[in-house]
Amino acid sequence: MQLLTPNEWMTKAASEIPDDQSAVLFMLHCERYTDPPDGDYSKLLLTPNGIKMANDIGTSINRKIRLLRSSPIERCKQTIREVIKFIPPEFAPTKDTEIKTSKDFFELLGNPSPKESGGVGWFEYFHYLQEHDVEAAQGISLEAETKHILDAIFAETLDSREAASYTDDSSTTAPLDLICSHDCHVIVLASALFDHKTDMSLTSKWCQFAEGLLFYGSRRNFTAFWRGQKKTFVDYL
């Protein structure tokens, strides 16, 4: 599979996905504007560079798009729309393919909001999850957060047999599902599946714009990619 993104490791990972396996790109939205003056991050949209980033990703895609899924937050839906604008016609989704939104790609089980408002704290929450400190994370485990997200990702994906029947006579390549979510969801998955650790502040260990995980397989037997690593999970959670 071909995929060109600002995160070079994802391009290499995509090339390792077998043609006959249905794939999922689960990614953070593209570059957005910075801190809002009113404190409402949900209103922030993509910058011109973020739009170009999404357009460039779309241009590179060489698999038929089957499903479009997103957080209900506008910048995530905007990222999907900007990606599919530039997908080559033979791989573009059909005109009646809607972007399905789900709170599972927006909300977490836990509360990483600021401590002064009763939350755990943003960077603190993910640190406690990674350290398996359930008490400090206010009763939420990394496994619980991960299962919640994985179940949502694989709820509508194809298994290998369905993927084979989905392809038409002129193609032996299985389809691609696009899902746009948030950095917190990407970090949860990377932490659980690849033992990724973040710092207590914003560093390169945090998820970058348009970065995410690639998957193929089924919920009970899937392969995942993250920052140069590849792992297969059987009956996980």
For the regions a language model picked out, list residue spans one by one.
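Short low-complexity stretches enriched in small and charged residues
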Residues: 23-26, 120-129, 168-173, 177-181
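Conserved glycosyltransferase catalytic-site signature
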Residues: 73, 77, 147, 183
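Phosphate-handling substructures
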Residues: 33-34, 39-45, 82-156
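Active-site-proximal alpha-helix that buttresses catalytic centers in soluble enzyme cores
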Residues: 1-92, 197-200, 204-222, 226
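Active-site-adjacent alpha-helix immediately C-terminal to a catalytic or transition-state-stabilizing loop
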Residues: 149-223
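Short glycine-rich phosphate-binding loop at a beta-alpha junction
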Residues: 65-74, 96-102, 178-179
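Acidic, His/Gly-rich catalytic cores of divalent-metal-dependent hydrolytic chemistry
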Residues: 228-237
